[in-house]
From Swiss-Prot:
UniProt keyword list: Amino-acid biosynthesis, Histidine biosynthesis, Hydrolase, Methionine biosynthesis, Multifunctional enzyme, NADP, One-carbon metabolism, Oxidoreductase, Purine biosynthesis
GO biological process: L-histidine biosynthetic process; methionine biosynthetic process; purine nucleotide biosynthetic process; tetrahydrofolate interconversion
Pathway: One-carbon metabolism; tetrahydrofolate interconversion
Biological role stated in the UniProt entry: Catalyzes the oxidation of 5,10-methylenetetrahydrofolate to 5,10-methenyltetrahydrofolate and then the hydrolysis of 5,10-methenyltetrahydrofolate to 10-formyltetrahydrofolate.
Binding-site residues, NADP(+): 166-168
Binding partners and assembly: Homodimer.
Catalysis performed (reactions): (6R)-5,10-methylene-5,6,7,8-tetrahydrofolate + NADP(+) = (6R)-5,10-methenyltetrahydrofolate + NADPH; (6R)-5,10-methenyltetrahydrofolate + H2O = (6R)-10-formyltetrahydrofolate + H(+)
Domain of life: Bacteria
Annotated protein name in UniProt: Bifunctional protein FolD
Family: Belongs to the tetrahydrofolate dehydrogenase/cyclohydrolase family.
GO annotations of cellular component type: cytosol
UniProt-listed Enzyme Commission number(s): 1.5.1.5, 3.5.4.9
GO molecular function: methenyltetrahydrofolate cyclohydrolase activity; methylenetetrahydrofolate dehydrogenase (NADP+) activity
Source organism of this protein record: Coxiella burnetii (strain CbuK_Q154)
Amino acid sequence: MIARILDGRTCAEKVKARVKENIRLLQEKGLPSPGLAVILVGNDPASATYVAHKERACQAVGIRSTVYRMPNTITESELASKIDECNRDSNTHGILLQLPLPAHIDPANLLERIRPDKDVDGFHPYNLGRLVQRRPALRPCTPYGVMTLLTETHENLEGKHAVIIGASNIVGRPMALELLLAKCTVTVCHRFTRDLAEHVKSAELLIVAIGKPGIIQSEWIKPGAIVIDVGFSRLSPNKIAGDIDFETAKERASWITPVPGGVGPMTVATLLENTLQAAQTFL
């Protein structure tokens, strides 16, 4: 068996085309384009690269983006004031606080400070609570991007045993909520999980989001499983790896995402979707 490739770049282009068309329709009605505020703290090269990518994606679909670059020495209260300013700005429909933040700043406090209806990352407790209640509003970008990508398989997910490796607030936990919403039976594995291999072997849908290359051995993968690799590690300037060895895993899976070119583009595309959705509540 050779797995079919779940191409995140192609799927993301479909999402972006829909967003661009909807923005064009807004403009035809004389309404303003959606506005996104991105708050970037410090000079972390990876964060700067991600923000630049998001800026280009916004420009391509017609979203106005403004990046507020803050020094690494900024205090939590100063950063909170900037968020408050964006909350009040009627031309800003979405707010994104680029993570990670410097060690002296508590991200939870600041993510909660963003207005829920402008929380385009989907991390506010209100938006996560809506997902828990099966009434989603703005949804976390990576998990919802994965769900959109899974539609490309045309597989019925109802009743499938989905195993998530990783329990972060950004991916693992909201991913579990999304899969429950899709009527999967969900197992979440984390650093205290015993017999990880046995859990992986039972997965009909395997989602790995740890950031440790090779953490999942390919022989653990159930033949015919759908495999989603959210991991992203830069091994050298020119080499990026996921959490699973793609070349050996594709011999067992029915569908698999590459790294790069799998989940990453879907995260950005979902951010654009969320920004449009947020704008539509104001316009």
